[in-house]
Amino acid sequence: MDAKQTRQGVLLALAAYFIWGIAPAYFKLIYYVPADEILTHRVIWSFFFMVVLMSICRQWSYLKTLIQTPQKIFMLAVSAVLIGGNWLLFIWAVNNHHMLEASLGYFINPLVNIVLGMIFLGERFRRMQWLAVILAICGVLVQLWTFGSLPIIALGLAFSFAFYGLVRKKIAVEAQTGMLIETMWLLPVAAIYLFAIADSSTSHMGQNPMSLNLLLIAAGIVTTVPLLCFTAAATRLRLSTLGFFQYIGPTLMFLLAVTFYGEKPGADKMVTFAFIWVALAIFVMDAIYTQRRTSK
C-alpha cells in the first residue's frame, strides 16, 4: 500500500471511530423506542441514504460491475447479518444501561482484529502483540473465575464487528456500493417487521411527533457515515493497523457513560478494563515503535 492510501485510511479511520464514540448520545435521545424498531429504521433509512449518495456521486457503474460477481453479493449478505446483529446488540446495550460494557467490547475489538488478521490473512504476530492478546484473554478469564460473570455483550460486539471487518477486507468491495448491497439484503426483513409486526407506541410514524420521526430518519446518517469511513479505511489499511484506532470510540463511550449517564463500573468490570487497557497500551507502544523503526 502506498503512502497516499495509508494517509487516507488513517483519516477515514479517525473519523469513523470518533463518530461511533459519540453515537450513544444519539441513541439515548430515542431510548424509549424499542431496540428492534430502531434497528429497522437504521436499515431502511440507511438504504435510502445510500441510494441518494450513489446517485449524487454517480457510482452506479460500481454496482453494475459488482452484480457480475455473485460470490461477492453472497459474501455481502454474510457481512450484512454480522453488522445487523452488531447494530441490534449495541442499541440494546446503550439504552439498557450497558454502555460501559459496550465500550469494553470495542476496547477488546482491536485485539480480536489482530487474531483474525493472523488466522485468516496471514499477518504475523510480533512478540508484544502476543503479550497484548494474552493479557486481554486473562482479563476476561479473571472476571469469569473471580466474579463468576462473563462480559457477553462486550464479547458479542467485539467478535461480530471484527468478523465484519474481516469479511469486508476479504471482499474488497468499494465502500458505498458494499453498504448499499448490505442494507438491500436487510431491507425486506426490516420493512416487514416495522410495518407488519412491530406494535408499540412509536412503531407508527404517522402518529409520531415530527421531532421523533426526524430523529429516526437521522439513524440512516448516523449509521452510514461512520460505517462508510470504516469500510473505506479497511480497504486502505492492514486489519491489524486498523485496530490501532479502535481505542478512540470506546474511550469516548466510557467517558459518556461515566460522566453523563451515571453508569458506575463494578469491581468485575474494572478488573477486565484494567487488563484491556494495559494490553492496548502495549499494543499501541509496539505499533509506534515498529512504525518508527521501519520508517528509518
Swiss-Prot record:
Taxon lineage: Bacteria, Pseudomonadati, Pseudomonadota, Gammaproteobacteria, Enterobacterales
Protein name per the record: Protein RarD
Subcellular location: Cell inner membrane
Regions that span the bilayer: 12-34, 38-60, 73-95, 100-122, 129-146, 150-167, 180-197, 212-234, 239-261, 271-290
Membrane topology (Periplasmic): 35-37, 96-99, 147-149, 198-211, 262-270
Membrane topology value: Multi-pass membrane protein
The organism's place on the tree of life at top rank: Bacteria
Pfam families: EamA (PF00892)
The gene coding this protein: rarD
One cellular component (GO) term of this entry: membrane
